[in-house]
């Protein structure tokens, strides 16, 4: 049985949230008060989603911060 490659939370952020909502990485970074580089690195899969970022994303998108932490945990464990 072939394993499916894990998806980094940054890809989900980009494809399921930013693109469909028409939000730029820069706009998100400014709105949640983090450096734009942080969002860019998350989207490109070179930075993990920290608890702090999960809280900010959760508040911004009106979903549980646990959603983001779970995505990161699943990616890390794959």
Question: For each of these PLM feature ranges, what is it?
Answer:
Residues 67-78:
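Short, charged recognition helix plus adjacent turn
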Residues 23-41:
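Short alpha-helical DNA-recognition segment
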Residues 46-59:
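Short, basic-rich loop-to-helix N-cap that marks the start of a DNA-contacting helix
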Residues 1-23, 70:
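A short, Lys/Arg-rich alpha-helix, primarily the initiator
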Residues 20, 31, 60:
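Residues within the alpha-helical elements of helix-turn-helix
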Residues 41, 45, 74:
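Alpha-helical DNA-recognition elements
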